[in-house]
């Protein structure tokens, strides 16, 4: 890597690292667009590096949880089969796009079909994230409400399994598998750990308390991250030097983010997070506009 490339990678890692430090969620939704648009990294490589970079962060969080005595993570293991299947589906789709040379013609402009499709998918995901943030702002969840019922509690789709995370209440295994499948596709195909969507889904749909939902998501993200990184590395989608520089910047960014977070109220945190999503959306739109207007 050139000096400019190294500085760019560290800067991107720094920016993305601030996000978990401030908001407590991964920055995969921002890392892939930044690597692709600003650093010119192909999307498959950006996704693979994102998986490897996030694994380091998740591992640190897992060690902290184990030290704190968190053990009731059966739900994470139930999510894992669906997540693993979704992961392989997402990576298979990514591999197909990597080798595709199909073109798309819009208003007389010839665009790379796969890159355009991927960017549009990222744009759609940003809109979903914006909706999630809006719902979080409207419906505040009481973290101490251990008996909160989820929207899917009344769905009697067998088999159902009683879990400690739900204080003995049962959960539908097929529905848990579907959630894992969706999160796995996001991880394998787009480099997103799924925490942004999995935590609200566990809280609102399955009635898991916020604290336990974060613990479950952290554990499942660790399991998924190991498999995702190995699978991407096997397919040549991981640039190890790039990952190292991203980790360096991310470590510095996380420290800075933690210092910033203690100075912001919950309302301001949500407002700033909405701005981060807006910025990510703007980056994607800028790249799409560049493709439309021509190289």
Regions picked out by a protein language model, each given a short descriptive name:
Residues 47-48, 214-215, 274:
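Conserved glycine-rich helix-kink/hinge and helix-boundary motifs of the Major Facilitator Superfamily
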Residues 3-5, 42-56, 184-189, 218, ...:
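Structural signature of hydrophobic alpha-helical transmembrane segments
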Residues 26-79:
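Juxtamembrane transmembrane-helix termini in multi-pass membrane transport proteins
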Residues 1-12, 67-182, 204, 234-295:
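Juxtamembrane transmembrane-helix boundary motif
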Residues 27-41, 96, 105, 127, ...:
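Membrane-embedded alpha-helical segments in integral membrane proteins
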Residues 215-228:
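Hydrophobic alpha-helical transmembrane segments of multi-pass integral membrane proteins
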Residues 13, 17-25, 29, 57-62, ...:
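Transmembrane alpha-helical segments of multi-pass membrane transport proteins and ion-pumping complexes
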Residues 31-45, 197-212:
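Interfacial segments of multi-pass membrane proteins
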């Amino acid at each position: 890597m050139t000096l400019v490339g190294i500085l760019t990678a560290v800067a991107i890692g720094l920016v993305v690292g601030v996000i978990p430090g401030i908001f407590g969620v991964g920055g995969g939704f921002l890392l892939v667009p930044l690597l692709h648009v600003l650093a010119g990294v192909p999307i498959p490589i950006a996704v693979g590096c994102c998986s490897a970079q996030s694994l380091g962060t998740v591992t640190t969080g897992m060690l902290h949880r184990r030290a704190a005595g968190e053990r009731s993570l059966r739900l994470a293991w139930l999510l894992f089969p669906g997540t693993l299947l979704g992961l392989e589906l997402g990576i298979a789709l990514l591999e197909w796009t990597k080798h595709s040379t199909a073109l798309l013609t819009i208003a007389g402009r010839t665009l790379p079909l796969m890159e355009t499709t991927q960017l549009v998918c990222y744009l759609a995901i940003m809109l979903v994230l914006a909706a999630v943030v809006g719902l979080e702002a409207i419906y505040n969840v009481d973290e101490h409400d251990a008996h909160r019922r989820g929207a899917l509690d009344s769905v009697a789709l067998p088999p159902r399994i009683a879990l400690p995370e739900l204080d003995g209440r049962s959960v539908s295994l097929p529905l848990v598998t579907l959630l894992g499948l969706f999160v796995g596709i996001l991880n394998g195909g787009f480099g997103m750990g799924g925490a942004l969507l999995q935590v609200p889904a566990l809280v609102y749909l399955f009635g898991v308390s916020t604290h336990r939902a974060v613990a479950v998501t952290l554990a499942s993200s660790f399991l998924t991250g190991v498999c995702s990184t190995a699978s991407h590395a096997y397919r040549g989608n991981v640039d190890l030097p790039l990952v190292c520089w991203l980790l360096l910047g991310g470590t510095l960014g996380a420290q800075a983010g933690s210092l910033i977070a203690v100075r912001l109220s919950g309302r301001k945190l949500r407002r700033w997070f909405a701005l981060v999503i807006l910025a990510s959306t703007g980056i994607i739109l800028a790249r799409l506009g560049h493709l439309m207007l021509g190289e």
